[in-house]
């Protein structure tokens, strides 16, 4: 089984749960977030339509199997161009 590389990107999307032990010390548990946890980090001021678009994009990103940095960059750029075109035409 292939182990995930520790990159700034993977570190930035790790979700940190802080728990308190009986003696007051803090422990941190790192886990890969699902799309709902990722969306919880977005500001709550976006419209429902914008929020739906963001959720769809995150679900598509999470569905990619073992993406390389190059393929991710290409995928994101294509999605961004498509999204930008739609924004200008609306």
From Swiss-Prot:
Cellular compartments annotated: Host mitochondrion inner membrane; Host nucleus; Host cytoplasm, Host cytosol
SS bonds (residue pairs): none
GO BP annotations, alphabetical order: symbiont-mediated perturbation of host apoptosis; symbiont-mediated suppression of host cytoplasmic pattern recognition receptor signaling pathway via inhibition of MAVS activity
Protein's UniProt keywords contain Membrane: yes
Keyword Membrane set for record: yes
UniProt keyword terms in alphabetical order: Apoptosis, Host cytoplasm, Host membrane, Host mitochondrion, Host mitochondrion inner membrane, Host nucleus, Host-virus interaction, Inhibition of host innate immune response by virus, Inhibition of host MAVS by virus, Inhibition of host RLR pathway by virus, Membrane, Modulation of host cell apoptosis by virus, Viral immunoevasion
Polar residues composition bias: residue spans: 1-28
Gene Ontology cellular component list: host cell cytosol; host cell mitochondrial inner membrane; host cell nucleus; membrane
Main location: host cell
Site for Low pathogenicity, residues: 66
Region described as Disordered: 1-30
Region (Mitochondrial targeting sequence): 65-87
Note: Is not encoded in all strains, and seems to be dispensable for replication.
Cited function: Plays an important role in promoting lung pathology in both primary viral infection and secondary bacterial infection. Promotes alteration of mitochondrial morphology, dissipation of mitochondrial membrane potential, and cell death. Alternatively, inhibits the production of interferon in the infected cell at the level of host mitochondrial antiviral signaling MAVS. Its level of expression differs greatly depending on which cell type is infected, in a manner that is independent of the levels of expression of other viral proteins. Monocytic cells are more affected than epithelial cells.
Family label: Belongs to the influenza viruses PB1-F2 family.
Quaternary state and interactors: Oligomer. Interacts with human SLC25A6/ANT3 and VDAC1. Interacts with host MAVS.
Protein name: Protein PB1-F2
Organism (species): Influenza A virus (strain A/Silky Chicken/Hong Kong/YU100/2002 H5N1 genotype X3)
């Amino acid at each position: 089984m292939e182990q995930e590389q520790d990159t700034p990107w993977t570190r930035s999307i790790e979700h940190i749960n802080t728990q308190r032990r009986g003696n007051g010390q803090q422990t941190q548990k790192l886990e890969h977030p699902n799309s709902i946890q990722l969306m919880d980090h977005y500001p709550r001021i976006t419209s429902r339509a914008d929020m739906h678009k963001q959720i769809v994009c995150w679900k598509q990103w999470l569905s990619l199997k073992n993406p390389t940095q190059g393929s991710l960059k290409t995928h994101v750029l294509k999605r961004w161009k498509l999204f930008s075109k739609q924004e200008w035409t609306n």
